[in-house]
Amino acid sequence: MKTKKTDALIYTVLIIMSILFFFPFYWMLRTAVVDAGSIFSPEMKILPPRIRLENFKNALTVQPFALYFVNTSLITVLNIIGVLLSSSLCAYGFSRLHWPGRDKVFGILLTALMLPYSVMMIPHFIGWNFLGLTNTFAPLIVPAYFGGGLFNIFLMRQFFLAIPDELDEAAYIDGAGRFRIYLSVILPLSKQVMIVVGLFTFLNNWNDYLAPMIYLSSDKKFTLMLGLNQFIGAYNAQWNLMMAAVAIVVFPSLVLYLFAQKYFIEGIAMTGIKA
């Protein structure tokens, strides 16, 4: 009897928490399909009396979202390629190769994770401005090919450490070199963590607002996040069109996570950072 009461209490709390977490998503969808005058109406109903699907069409035509989508997709795809390539190589060097001071160097590098992006923001901008590469995609893409981020290296290193060393030794006896072992042994066994890092990279770049705002000044180079900000004027905001655009922008992230959910959970568990 006590167990049933405990289970009922747990499920009740979970249902309440689910409703609280789902409410912002519901509010986004509801705002996206009503007219501007009904958003903050005191007689708000759960389902709007009239659903205006034309808001989605208007949201995509009032701003050049096709161009913003291409820009964001280009930045995101190139970042995913760069992060997976460079972070896996760095993680391989810190996990499978044995050299003096390896773990100490890695520990020193991890201290950089304590530095917030705001600390490095101005020095980075000064450097890119000195190179004449502001208002280009270079500051948003090139860093991915030089390490791929310490957190991603950490995730992959933890995963690589769980792979038995005997596999490396067997491949080495068969005549494989270090790079061949990386390509033929380590990467094929690391599908889960590669998907996790790829998903993190996708979300970070797809939803990034700060970095594009700092480096991009031309409308033709705007990303989706900067495009969403165009719905907010000096004296008013088109909230219904903005929420319609937000719903469209969020959709790829939801679909990608649903398809990669299994590998995402497995990768997190096997890297050793689960709760």
What annotation goes with each model-predicted range?
Residues 2-275:
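A structural signal for multi-pass alpha-helical bundles of membrane permease subunits
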